[in-house]
Amino acid sequence: MTEQEIRQLIHAQRRFFFTGETIPVRYRMEMLRRLKACILKREKEIELALKKDLGKSTFESYMCETGLVLSEISYMLKHTPSFAKEQRVHTPLAQFHSRSFRKPSPYGVCLIMSPWNYPFLLTIDPLVDAIAAGNTAVIKPSAYSPHTSQVIKELIEECFDPRYVAVVTGGRAENTCLLKEHFDYIFFTGSQNVGREVMKLSLIHISEPTRR
């Protein structure tokens, strides 16, 4: 994907986010159910890709990757309605006629950058949380686990409109192009050296990064 295509993708996601379509809880729940169905449909493909990339057994693939993702989806399906509710908070005396609430709100367009060692779990698990929170997401899986990255790309393309969730594959050139753009939140999992670079570049656009 070229730099121009990446920029157009991010702009398309931002426009989609501003429509407000991702905000209703019922939409988030529907998307989580759709993701779960797509994962279950492609479970064997995911298992095979993890074996090719990392030599993981069927047991390890499920217990350390796919099963944990499915568990996170189940958790979010159960708790997203309560997480999204307004929370009553104390009202200052000067505004005693009023009532005060804290309302959880999504960030907007998120970037998820994942590593090679747990390529399915550390890509899709953050995506589950991004969807549950009402965001859109661009996913950049690792170039060092190519078979798993390809399965993730095919799964996401089958499951979602690219204006909502999209995958950008490739290596350092694509990483650099992505980090030049404005994201509202960046979720990065990887080495400290790369994490520092992500942090530095994200601050140019005042993005809020999470490093892990």
Task: State each model region's role.
Residues E208-R212:
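Short "domain-exit" segments at the C-terminal end of structured domains
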